[in-house]
Curated annotation (Swiss-Prot):
Catalyzes the conversion of lactate to pyruvate. This is L-lactate dehydrogenase 2. Substrate binds at residues 85, 91, 123-126, 151-154, 232. The active site is at residue 178. One of its GO terms (molecular function) is L-lactate dehydrogenase activity. Pathway: Fermentation; pyruvate fermentation to lactate; (S)-lactate from pyruvate: step 1/1. One of its GO terms (cellular component) is cytoplasm. Its main location: cytoplasm. It catalyses: (S)-lactate + NAD(+) = pyruvate + NADH + H(+). The modification Phosphotyrosine is found at residue 223. Belongs to the LDH/MDH superfamily. LDH family. Its EC number is 1.1.1.27. It comes from Bacillus anthracis. NAD(+) binds at residues 16, 37, 42, 68, 82-83, 121-123, 146.
Amino acid sequence: MKKGINRVVLVGTGAVGCSYAYSMINQGVAEEFVLVDVNEAKAEGEAMDLSHAVPFSPSPTKVWSGSYADCKDADLVVITAGLPQKPGETRLDLVEKNTKIFKQIVRGIMDSGFDGIFLIATNPVDILTYVTWKESGLPKERVIGSGTTLDSARFRYMLGDYLDVDPRNVHAYIVGEHGDTELPVWSHATIGVQKLETILANNEQYKQEDLDKIFENVRDAAYHIIERKGATYYGIGMSLLRVTKAILNNENSVLTVSAYLEGQYGEKDAYVGVPAVINREGVREIVELELNEEEKAKFAHSVKVLKETMAPVL
């Protein structure tokens, strides 16, 4: 890594990758930004287009299309490459196809001498983050998945809309698989400093069945969006930007990334969406919430499904 210069390499210039790339340039997050894609002409075109936006950015960024060799001096490699989720297809349906793709990508990156942090977004993200960790040989702290950062953002937005509160003042987490078995941590949800359960108890207009419907809409959001426009990319692009800023700026921010469990939440040897403190070293620590019995059971089920799905492809 070059001292004093933040280099981020993006592998995959599809809709998700380009949404992330645009947000990176828009906010001037890194000094160097490299785009890599199997379709070299596409990566080159995107780099050209993005570079023309740099004069409008808050700080200058050198943008170019490159290769895995550019990962050698990278602080962060973000992977969005892979086959997208089709209408009616679950994230876990993608596991076999994208695992093969990922193993090749990670090997190519590591051959460059890369020694930074991986941030994974390709689905099924928890499984592919685990695959990246295994293939790379890097410490677990330096391999991170986008996890349930987007799910938690959707959750906060919808709760804020329901309660007529700025979603930035809604503190609520979605944990577990980024997918069908994820779960809301109702027991720790707060609006400002007030517990959501207290607000419910003191206001007749707010009902638990409405909250349950909100969670269903959060869990199924990708399906609804894919049915209408074919893919999701703006939300995940901003989620990746948020994690990137936490890493490069050494923020020690708590984000629900896919992190490796070693006994936390009663689970081991799995990458799962949980609150974690993120800084320049990657995952500084996992924040272990005290779940109620129902939440514990649902979390254990989510991890079990991930492990069962992952086993045949490792």
